[in-house]
Amino acid sequence: MKKLAITMGDPAGIGPEIIIKALVHAKIRGSCRPIIVGDRTPLEEAIALLKLSVQLRVVQSPEEYRAAPKGRTIELIDMGVAKKIRKGKPTAEGGKASVHYIQKAVELALDKHVDGIVTAPISKEAIHMAGFKWPGHTEMISELTHTRDYAMMFVGGPLRIILVTIHTPLKKVPSLISKDRVVKTLRLAKKACEMLGMKSPKIAVAGLNPHAGEAGLFGDEEIREINPAVREALGEGIPVAGPFPPDVIFHKAYRGEFDLVVCMYHDQGLIPLKMVAFDKGVNMTVGLPIIRTSPDHGTAYDIAWEGIANPASMIEAIKLAAKLRI
């Protein structure tokens, strides 16, 4: 079984709760060997909150976690950085702790001590309060792994989407849609299909404009940038079609006509995916030298530490990480 490092995320959010709920779930116990990278105090508080009979086994070195734990025992690398955190709010302390967890997990994965990482939600506000400037997990991990070409991808229900631009204001998106950027994303889309074990994938490209530009009447990015990118990708042997009108392509993918949709911007892809898999969507980063997945939701401070957080997305993120291959 794959060993997976599960980062605890922001201790003030729902991360500790959904991790504990996920790791005692029957679908997870037999699918992988999880090791939490986090802090003992919040996890013990989460176990007590949930009234679960679970034991934490603290390990500090790779040698210690070569022997699989027995029964309802969960392994933890105790970072010792979040003993007193104000719950339900973004804080500099929580932001700093969540970054430390990620740094440790990435180190373990790069050194081949674990086979992949699954990251619980962090708060962009909290990590900025702690003095870090990354926009989010994806950019942070790409820097930690010295990765230049990467993409954010989401899996949920029958849909899989990959983004050409990530956390970009909508008004800036058109200026970022270039042939080179789209080709790069198409190459990563092909890699994603390989990671998922697809032998004959069908990749679609969504247009940027209404009706995919309608031959230039509603915008010419399709003519200038996206069409040339599709032609170049086809020349490289990438199985791609499009660009398709954005209001049509997701229905085609939902029916199984395509395995993966390349989307021009964040909400173009995330809105349809969350319509069909709001509670079970998974974020994965493509292009890294390591496997990384994450639940497709945030810290949910508003319901944190009430015992009501839904672990479904975390469960799916762990299951997907256990199946992926580099």
Label each PLM-derived region with a short phrase.
Residues 154-183:
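Ligand-binding beta-strand-loop-alpha-helix segment within the catalytic cores
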Residues 129-151:
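Glycine/threonine-rich beta-strand-loop-alpha-helix active-site module
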Residues 140, 152, 161-163, 290-292:
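Conserved hydrophobic/aromatic beta-strand scaffold that supports enzyme active sites
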Residues 65, 142, 150-153, 194-195:
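A generic local secondary-structure boundary/capping motif
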Residues 1-137, 180-264, 268-274, 278-283, ...:
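Contiguous, glycine/small-aliphatic-enriched amphipathic segments in soluble metabolic enzymes
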